[in-house]
Amino acid sequence: MSVIKMTDLDLAGKRVFIRADLNVPVKDGKVTSDARIRASLPTIELALKQGAKVMVTSHLGRPTEGEYNEEFSLLPVVNYLKDKLSNPVRLVKDYLDGVEVAEGELVVLENVRFNKGEKKDDEALSKKYAALCDVFVMDAFGTAHRAQASTHGIGKFADVACAGPLLAEELDALGKALKEPARPMVAIVGGSKVSTKLTVLDSLSKIADQLIVGGGIANTFVAAQGHNVGKSLYEADLVEEAKRLLTTCDIPVPTDVRVATEFSETATATLKSVNDIKDEEQILDLGDVSAQKLADILKNAKTILWNGPVGVFEFPNFRKGTEIVANAIADSDAFSIAGGGDTLAAIDLFGISDKISYISTGGGAFLEFVEGKVLPAVAMLEERAKK
């Protein structure tokens, strides 16, 4: 990969625009999992140390584009950064027509998704972003797979576009793991975003020796075996695709699950066979037998790719499946790479971050890179390096 790296540049006195991935979970105005901010801090600190005029921004959540919404403000991130940095930190809400930044100061530009045209990679918006800086630093691996104004468009028009240390490190680590992985290689795909990930399984089946599914994806496979999944999250229109995958790949489908009659933190968990799910019930976690079966598979792995929890681990009663799988990964001798927001939150919750070989800040980007797809932001950086 041939890109300009931020670490090769002299940033003293330069206006530096860092696109980080600060899309973290927030509850009651407080950051509940800081993994992505922690990962971005060294880049921010390096730019400040060099005497740059530093701006950093990110998306957070899914607000209606073009509208300010306090619920999705980066204010909780700013408060977190104020605690961690000795430099002054301030949040700027309106910045598209210019912003003054002092050397040694960190200015956080409000949620990029409040700007109309962000997601469509609007050229006029991209040029406004580019006009704010001398150097654009793309450091958000988590959004490198999206061609958007703050991740891709700005880079085409900024004087200099480079890869931040975190992005460069991510690409190197993932590249090494995928080039010649130690075998057997096990890929775990879980979480709630079903349709985006079911298509990924096809590609992964060609790379990995064993696929494991969890969460909403697993429910689609349970349905594909002819079981009633009640009110569970699953994709009815992808059941045929799941059936096809079951004939071509060895995918362990849950045989026992934890169900509830409501989706809430206080819902009662009932352990039962997948043969006995009622219409009013929904699957929220794996059962102990199914989770242990996955743990046994992971024990023998030499490379593990982990993207997504296997149950609604945010609810204490539906945490056990993900905990069993997480601990099996932590106890394994395999080279393990974990990615995705929910996965990072699970790693934090179970306190196993020091037992995972590499933690990627990317979710969708992580999966697309694993699939061998071109990431638009990376392609843009490679193009800019030629000029």
Swiss-Prot record:
Catalysis performed (reactions)? (2R)-3-phosphoglycerate + ATP = (2R)-3-phospho-glyceroyl phosphate + ADP
Q: Which SUPFAM superfamilies match?
A: Phosphoglycerate kinase (SSF53748)
Give the GO molecular function terms.
ADP binding; ATP binding; phosphoglycerate kinase activity
Q: Where does ATP bind?
A: 197, 314, 340-343
Keyword terms of this UniProt record: ATP-binding, Cytoplasm, Glycolysis, Kinase, Nucleotide-binding, Transferase
Keyword Cytoplasm on entry: yes
The EC number(s) this enzyme carries: 2.7.2.3
Q: What class of enzyme is it?
A: transferase
Q: Where in the cell is it found?
A: Cytoplasm
Provide one Gene Ontology cellular component. cytosol
Q: In which pathway does it act?
A: Carbohydrate degradation; glycolysis; pyruvate from D-glyceraldehyde 3-phosphate: step 2/5
GO biological process annotation, one example = glycolytic process
> What Pfam family is a match, any one?
PGK
Report the InterPro entries cross-referenced here.
Answer: Phosphoglycerate_kinase, Phosphoglycerate_kinase_CS, Phosphoglycerate_kinase_N, Phosphoglycerate_kinase_sf
Give the domain of life: Bacteria
Major site of localization recorded for this protein: cytoplasm
Positions that bind substrate: 21-23, 36, 59-62, 113, 146
* HAMAP family in alphabetical order: Phosphoglyc_kinase
Report the family membership: Belongs to the phosphoglycerate kinase family.
What quaternary structure, including any partners, is listed in this protein's UniProt entry?
Answer: Monomer.
Q: What's the protein called, per UniProt? A: Phosphoglycerate kinase
Q: Which organism is it from?
A: Enterobacter sp. (strain 638)
